[in-house]
Amino acid sequence: MSTREIRIATRKSALALWQAEYVKARLEQAHPGLQVSLVPMVSRGDKLLDAPLAKIGGKGLFVKELETALLDNEADIAVHSMKDVPMDFPEGLGLYCICEREDPRDAFVSNTFKSLEALPAGSVVGTSSLRRQAQLLARRPDLEIRFLRGNVNTRLAKLDAGEYDAIILAAAGLVRLGFEDRITSTISVDDSLPAGGQGAVGIECRSADSEIHALLAPLHHIDTADRVVAERALNKRLNGGCQVPIACYAVLEGDQLWLRGLVGQPSGGTLLVADARAPRASAEALGVQVAEDLLSQGAEAILKEVYGEAGHP
């Protein structure tokens, strides 16, 4: 076993650093003697905290700087939250590992109310996600959705300061950072369909670096990967970045994959839903099939409206 060093490019947020440390520990466990170090950096998405994500440029907000580090040989792998990873990669880079998925659900967090259903009319709910907003308002048009950005600690502090009656966050992020006790209730995927890849960690590296590919192989979780491939194929067919009101979630049932996709107006006025099953070997085709169903229902008009407001394709 080579003892070469692996340098991990990562964002500096607490959650990103947790993910990088997780990958570091898994690599060291799989390959005793391997030297693994972190190369923390700040992404554009981390710098622009005063505007909704959908308005500051959709795709690659949290990964571009990390990809530049790979291309410039300043790092060997980049660790990403899969829901932030664009569908297409720069020439010379690719996604070579998807780790086992954590809980993909959204979490309801409140100091006063036990669940979404318990919120009184007019309650203020914080989220930065158009996907969550569309589904929340479809169920509860009487709620006020208010913009919420920042890292997990910042968002919890804003809730504790009384700026919101409740906030919606990814359950996986709260669990990973030790805030499991702050989850008031988890929201079922039937009530809040997750973002594609939510809860999964992906590893990007140089396409030609076969030694790195071999080192990553023990971390690759094929069941998670098949599910995420279907979800990402749906996103790609809809030309979706990570900041659009698109949700998708795949489940393995034996050798069959079941995939549900959703496109919603941020106002909650219209929610389009489609689902289908296929052999897991056809994960990518399944994603395209469900996306085509959504397009046939009018998804393109909803997404064009959102992109028009955001000012980017």
From Swiss-Prot:
The modification S-(dipyrrolylmethanemethyl)cysteine is found at C242. CDD domains: PBP2_EcHMBS_like. InterPro entries: HemC (IPR000860), Porphobilin_deaminase_cofac_BS (IPR022419), Porphobilin_deaminase_N (IPR022417), Porphobilinogen_deaminase_C (IPR022418), Porphobilinogen_deaminase_C_sf (IPR036803). Keywords: Porphyrin biosynthesis, Transferase. Pathway: Porphyrin-containing compound metabolism; protoporphyrin-IX biosynthesis; coproporphyrinogen-III from 5-aminolevulinate: step 2/4. It is an enzyme of class 2 (transferase). It holds the Pfam family Porphobil_deam. GO terms for biological process: protoporphyrinogen IX biosynthetic process. Its cofactor is dipyrromethane. Its EC number is 2.5.1.61. One of its GO terms (molecular function) is hydroxymethylbilane synthase activity. Belongs to the HMBS family. Monomer. The porphobilinogen subunits are added to the dipyrromethane group. Tetrapolymerization of the monopyrrole PBG into the hydroxymethylbilane pre-uroporphyrinogen in several discrete steps. This is Porphobilinogen deaminase. It comes from Pseudomonas entomophila (strain L48).
